[in-house]
Amino acid sequence: MSNQLPVNYTTQETRTAIENAAAAGAGDYKCLVCIFLFGASDSHNMVVPYGNGNPNRSLYETARAYGVRLGDKNVTNQFSNELDSMTLNGAGGPGTSPGGGAVAYEWALHPSLTRLRSDWYDGDLAIVRDVGVLNRPTTKELYNTNPNDLYRPDRLFAHNIQQLAWQKALPFRSPESTGWFGRTTNLLDEFFNPDMRVSSGCISVSGANPQTFAYSPKINVVYPATVIPEGKSRSYINFTTTRDNFYHKNSPDASPVGYPPLPKNNVMNAFSRIFRNSVDSQAAVNSNGGGWDENDGGVGTQLEAIFDNAYTEIINTTLDTPDPNDVNGSNSRTLPNSYFINTMKNIAKVIYSRGDVSGVGFNQRRQLIFSGVGGWDNHNNLRYFHDPNLKTLDICIKALRDAVKLMGLENNVTIFTETDFGRTFRSNGTYGTDHAWSGHSFVVGGAVKGGMYGPEPDYILGGDKDVSNLGRFIPNYSIEQYYGTLLKWFDIPDAQIPLVLPAIDLFTPTNIGFME
């Protein structure tokens, strides 16, 4: 398995195309922020068929038990209005949406997603329906008659394999280990980020992740750097003053000062280089006042307050979810994953430190930032866990968007979701849902053309789109089509997008159209 940069990344044709793209937008800035929902979020409860006019509403009510589905009236009417205030009609009714995407019938967002619903009405939220891993365009017949062939992704319902499939976006059974963020930075950095102070234009704020793995010689960058040399305390690293004492900055393959030399091309040398780049990322932020000066009485103070207030809201919020064993009762739950707001804050710090101010910062025109949060594998008591997870996600996205707006970058930063796979449309016997295939994804930002994308779903159990009788639906869009639309906005020319997404030309269209 080779991790060497392919020759077609460095041909004169490719280099000229990327150089011209960089020159055309000289001085501009764009950032893609991925939020990976580890465990597979149930998107059928994120975006819900609503109203008698939507033929999928009756299918939804039949397939999902009380305590799993949304929009029920219990005896006390406690939950009767939970969808009434969350409809996604456009200005002209269900036939339109704010950004022009098609909405043939009424739909609603989960009641935990009030802030994202505001983004919808601002035209800043795209809902891309039925996205998933596809080897090539697939029908139920092809899936059933070719069980060991190209129409069935490897270990389709396995978390780890499908997470890698989303993060790598490589052709069927490719031996490579790179991720699509990493390959993007291989393609763009020379001309969009030529003087940056870390090895790569993509950074993970959630630990080392395959999505950011690039071809050699690019090295993964993790922020904040959290790995400490053996025998040293956490306080050993003062990132703004001691990084040159930890390694020889100007000698990429040098060993840390005071440590034995490291032979080239071994695991420890690779680890040292990854750590050095992560330390550099920390230094780039710290050189910019730790991201910002929270005591400056201006923008820094306001940015700090955004995340402090969001954290306070998360830890002080409780939700009442239906008790599936008692139609009169509810379960009260505090919001989990309060740490995720700190992840959003770290993303904001990386974005804030994007530029070159008196020799500090990342000096990047194109940034790709990976983040992730777990807790979405809800086989049991879905609403007790899923509802507060969605509320946390809603608060976190709003905080990051508020910070980006304060920086004047509302149209420059696009946030999008990924997850392992969809969940079964039919609930199971423990008031949860199981592993499935396609699901719905969110894209949020000032450059997003808000609305619904993709045809009306076919939610008939055992129907033409269901490869089981449980509601495991074939994706309408491949992940390549989803990512390709984002890369087009990122100014990668059409002819070069297959370098990042080698299988994209198997699918039509290659641009779904949800970005300006």
Predicted feature residues:
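Feature for exported/extracytoplasmic and membrane-associated proteins, marking the mature portion
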Residues: M1-I395, A399-L406, G446-E516
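Proline-centered loop/turn at the N-terminus of a beta-strand
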Residues: D124-A126, T414, H440
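Active-site lining segments that contact anionic ligands and/or coordinate catalytic metals
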Residues: R366-L368, E410-N412, E418, A436-G439, ...
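Metal-dependent active-site segment of extracytoplasmic phospho-/sulfohydrolases and closely related
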Residues: I397, A403-G429
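Histidine-centered active-site microenvironments of extracellular/periplasmic hydrolases
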Residues: T419-M452
